[in-house]
Amino acid sequence: MVENWDKMAKGLHRMANFLKGQGIYDEHRLPTNAVLAVIAALYAYIPDSGDKMGQDELLLKKYLWYAFFTERYENSAASHAFVDFNALKRIITGECKQDGSNYGIEDVPIFSEQSLAEVEELITAEWPKRATIRGRGVLAVACRLEAHDFASGDQLTPDNIKGRHYHHIYPDALLKEAGINSFLAMNCALIDDKTNWDIGRKDPKQYLMDRYKWTSETIVSERLQSHLIPIKELETGGYENLSDPEKNMKLAADFRAFICRRAELVFKAVKLLAEGRQLNASEICREQT
């Protein structure tokens, strides 16, 4: 181990930089730590620059997002990660099979034996602070899009992430009164702590109207889209003059429409990330799924 210390340290450093490039800035936002050893160890076989580095890191990106949105590491994570490491290493090093053909992505279990989570599975993903892989995976997509603060517009960075709070887009108090579970990943946005307190228990429509008074609708939309928050489904409200049964029925329908639409947007982003593609929040939100 002592002889390989420099190589190990370099691998860890490159892994950390790679994760930052994917919007993973700290351990609290990492969906599964099973990927850490795999990526760090693979960097021993990846050059520092050039086309080969780009090719290999594209493979790592695909691997990372499959790890976040499949069930591969829900159980026996360490043993599964070791198998995936060996298969990925064969691709990166150009190892050949007995028939002379190269190993490919179809030979890696995380790709060949797993399917990406579907929209319905994303809808039920738990609150990201609870440290479930899928719940944190949903939040990781927003972090990858730099999760702009609703009020200031500040982008998420390694320097300000510790000042971000887990915000209920539909207020917890409002949903709780109607007997609706608010602690879903699709109802979460990572925003500045002061913004979180300022919003309080305002319904989404009221908060949007408050923002429109001092900034443009376009700017507000851009900030919300960086979290893949669908604007149309958020422009609800009008619960004040309804009876409790009417309010609860309307709120349940509005909330269901919101989380379903947001799950569709997240699913579209996940598919792009799992292909190693770049993300553009406005394009994802603008196009129909």
Task: Give, region by region, the residue ranges found by the protein language model.
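Polyanionic (Asp/Glu-rich) segments that form extended negatively charged tracts
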Residues: 1-48
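Substrate-recognition/cap regions that form aromatic- and gly/pro-loop-enriched pockets
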Residues: 188-197
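Histidine-centered nuclease catalytic patch
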Residues: 157-187, 200-205
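C-terminal, well-folded lobe of enzymatic/effector domains
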Residues: 220-289
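Polybasic, low-complexity binding patches
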Residues: 179-181, 199-229
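Charged/polar, low-hydrophobicity segments characteristic of intrinsically disordered regions
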Residues: 1, 64-88, 92, 221-238
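Intrinsically disordered, low-complexity N-proximal targeting/linker segments that flank membranes
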Residues: 68-166, 174
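Short secondary-structure subsegments characteristic of cysteine-rich extracellular domains
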Residues: 53-68
